[in-house]
Every structure is written in C-alpha cells, then in structure tokens.
Amino acid sequence: YRAADKAAALGADALIVADTAVMAHCRREHPGLRLHLSVQASATTHAAIEFYRQRYGIQRAVLPRVLTVQQVAQVVRQSQVDIEVFGFGSLCVMVEGRCTLSSWVTGQSPNNAGVCSPPGAVRWSETPDGGVDAELGGMLIDHYEPTESRAYPTLCKGRFMVDGRRGYALESPTSLNTLALLPELIAMGVAAIKIEGRQRSAAYVEQVTRVWRQAIDRAAADPARFDVAPAEVAALARHAEGQQHTLGAYERPWR
C-alpha cells in the first residue's frame, strides 16, 4: 500500500498491479490513478480481463506471452480496456515470473521481489581456465568459457549435466522479438508494446527503446511497406539472450 500511495503522491501516470488487495486500495484511495493489470495476473481471456475491469477499474491489461497472434486479436476485439503485449525481451517458462525454481534457490519470490535473480544471490567467480562460474544462491548454474559472452543468470536458463551431457536442461537463452509483427499488431488495435526490462542497464533501455520507437513510427506511418531493417535486427541482437530471436507463442511453430 505504501508504495502505491507514494507513487500516487509523486504523480505517477499509472500503476502496474497484480495483487487484488492493492488494486482495491488504489481504486478506493486513488480513484483517478490508472491501473494497468500486470502480466503476473495471468489474464489471458476477455472474461478474466472483464472481471478485473468491473471489480477494480483497470484500464489496461498486459497479456502473458502464451497467446498466438489470432488469440491476441480476439482479446483486443472483445475487451473494453487497452491491451498491451510483449514485444522484446526475455521469455519465461514459468507462469510469467511466478517461479518456484528461483524462490527455492534464493528464498525470495520473484513476484514480490521483482527480480528473477536477486543481485545479492548472484556470484561470479573466475576459474583457473580463465572462464567464469555463475552461481545463484550458492548453486552453480553455469560456466562460461573465456570467449563466451555471459547471460543474465537465471536458473531456468542454466547449463547442467544431464545423462552425462552438459546443456540447457529447461530453456535455451533466446529473446522474444516481434518487430516483424508490428503492422499486424497495430492493425488489430494493440495499445502498447511492452519491452521486458528486469535488471537491465540504462544502456539497454536507451538502445532498445530507440530501435523500437523508430520501428513503431515507420510501421504506423506506412504499414503496407513496413519491413524490418537489418540494422534494427543487428542492434537488438546485441541485447538478445544467446543473440537469438524468436516469435515465441505468437506463431507457435512447435504445433
């Protein structure tokens, strides 16, 4: 409550919320403050979003990264609130951040602490071969060779020995990138693109948002002729996990 009250006092434009008690408090104490339903509420249908609109007065909902483009379009058509979708950043194999793996290792809830890997639980150490070990909560989750770039250390994207082979046991580091879908997302009425930014640097924020701002402006001005520029792909690849991009559930190639 105190964080919400302070944000309102400072003149915040909106709050991103998942906790229903906080929503109820804000609607009662700060009726003029916009409430955006967090992705961690896991609202994937019009009915779920409508419940939050009627009960708590939300004005925008952030959709989880589990829907196809067609499903997103259906939610946009049926909803009476703005719809925001993820456009770039890390993917989550858990229920959008509510990760029991991270909680088990660090003793902190990512949902409440706001980070997958709390800084105090992360430890980097050089090894005799010139590489680097990455530990989370005292558990070794990866080893990087001297020539390898290091990724944001999360348990779900660590490399472990399984059946005598070392590799990614749960998920390979790959970033969501929906630049190619911009004309389609704009046409269906998506209100905003969300760029994942947990524990990212100021340089990441500046460079990634600059690329997306330019691409969105071009797509909005002339959607029929929009094409992703190679320079944009290269710029985002520098910030992509594993330097790989995917459309994720938006296209579901695994079906």
What is each PLM-predicted segment?
Residues 1-43, 62, 70-192, 199-255:
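Active-site pocket-lining/capping segments in soluble small-molecule metabolic enzymes
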Residues 44-48:
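Short, glycine/polar-rich helix-capping loops at beta-to-alpha or helix-loop-helix junctions
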Residues 55-58, 85:
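A cross-taxonomic marker for long C-terminal extensions/tails that follow the last structured domain
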Residues 65:
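Cys/His-rich Zn2+-binding cysteine-cluster or related metal-binding knuckle/ribbon modules and their
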